[in-house]
């Protein structure tokens, strides 16, 4: 059963950016999340939270994504560790807890130099910049928005650039 899930998760990660709704459908085929290994459960909640975020579902609680941050924080999986903290930040941002969101976003940056996913970095910097904007800390806001812009430029992602410039 374990290898079956790792294949499913890999597929889910591949199609996430284009088809997050399909990821939700895929994840719904897993019968009992409590029967999963610790790693598989962490992956499940990370993918679930990411797919819900990308399909604009409102987050109600950070207890599930917390399982992912607790697991990945103990690993060397830089990308998933960063993603778990980012999505935990997104969740508490939804819950209107800006200080905690900021804390989690900055935790997502702890291995910044090792992250090569520029689309992810662009979104992360943008989220940090937006929070600083709301707090009227404009110098830091501009710093992170510029970093966001640079990430999307590296991607040649015109959609991403227009998203930051609005």
Sequence positions of predicted segments:
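A "functional boundary" signal
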Residues: 2-166
